A protein has these predicted regions:
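N-terminal secretory signal peptides and thylakoid transit peptides that target proteins
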Residues: 1-19
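C-terminal region of N-terminal signal peptides and the immediate post-cleavage residues
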Residues: 19-37
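Functionally critical loop-and-helix segments that line ligand-binding/catalytic clefts
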Residues: 36-47, 51-53, 181-240
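Hydrophobic faces of well-ordered beta-strands that scaffold small-molecule active sites
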Residues: 40-42, 62-64, 96-99, 139, ...
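Substrate-binding cleft of extracellular glycoside hydrolase catalytic domains
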Residues: 46, 64-148
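Anion (oxyanion) recognition and catalysis
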Residues: 55, 90, 164, 168
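Active-site cleft segment of glycoside hydrolase catalytic domains centered on the general acid/base Glu
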Residues: 146-167
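Aromatic-lined carbohydrate-recognition surfaces of secreted/lumenal glycan-active proteins
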Residues: 169-181
């Protein structure tokens, strides 16, 4: 049986906590508050959470998928983000960030290299635009793995170049561990970085990270499981 990133981090986590509507903001933000005090964002795929409940939980907004449900992903009721959800978040003063991930593990998007990057970037751009995303807002392309340096050079870097060829360097974000972020920086790939902790030594925040995913699968808002992400820089790819 294969073990996923979420399995590794979930098994390492303490007993899950539950938060919901009406719980004080400190319950959500205090354990994960960023050093700069910029707040936290939620990311989730299993459903759509009303803006009122996100606000009540103490989050500044959401990182939302502009990607389709993959085969067997019928539980991903929150994919892709729809314009009605985006309007609800905007009208309630919450931040929105776009991210893209279709495949996972053996079907990971980045395994297809540059041609896959072009294909997925085109689809991400379509869904981002359909949801009302601004033309200048970035999309985070997911490297939801702990790739080796050889995998980075042969597959991840070409995948990111594919994204940049479609939406441009300034609009390409990278979701990856701190090692992947460092390699991308060395190659001049990506303008925004969202760090996860699978393969990030000690879970330390990379200095270039705009966002840092610090907790997964431990909390629930509005009946939907959420991950917690620290905002590390004032500009983190939010819709303007």
């Amino acid at each position: 049986m294969s073990v996923s990133r979420r399995d590794v981090l979930r098994f390492a986590a303490a007993t899950p906590a539950l938060i919901g509507l009406g719980v004080a903001a400190e319950s959500l933000c205090a354990p994960s508050a960023s050093a700069d005090g910029l707040g936290v964002l939620l990311d989730y795929a299993a459903g759509v959470i009303p803006a009122s409940q996100i606000r009540a939980a103490g989050a500044a907004g959401s990182i939302r998928y502009v990607s389709d449900r993959r085969p067997g992903g019928n539980w991903m009721l929150g994919k892709p983000m729809q314009i009605s959800e985006a309007r609800d978040l905007n009208q309630n003063g919450l931040k929105i960030v776009s991210c893209y991930q279709y495949g996972k593990e053996s079907s990971a998007d980045w395994l297809g290299g540059q041609s896959a990057g072009i294909q997925h970037a085109r689809r991400g751009w379509q869904l981002h635009t359909a949801a009302g995303g601004p033309a200048g807002a970035p999309i985070y392309a997911s490297i939801d793995d702990d790739p080796s340096y050889e995998q980075y050079k042969q597959q991840v870097a070409p995948y990111l170049r594919g994204w940049e060829s479609v939406i441009g360097h300034q609009r390409t974000g990278v979701y990856g561990n701190s090692k992947t972020i460092e390699w991308a920086l060395q190659d001049g790939l990506g303008a925004y970085f969202w760090q996860h902790n699978w393969g990030s030594p000690g879970g330390r925040t990379h200095p270039a990270a705009n966002l840092h995913q610090v907790e997964i699968d431990r909390r629930n808002v509005g009946g939907v499981g959420v991950d917690i992400n620290n905002i590390c820089k004032p500009q983190f790819g939010q819709w303007a």
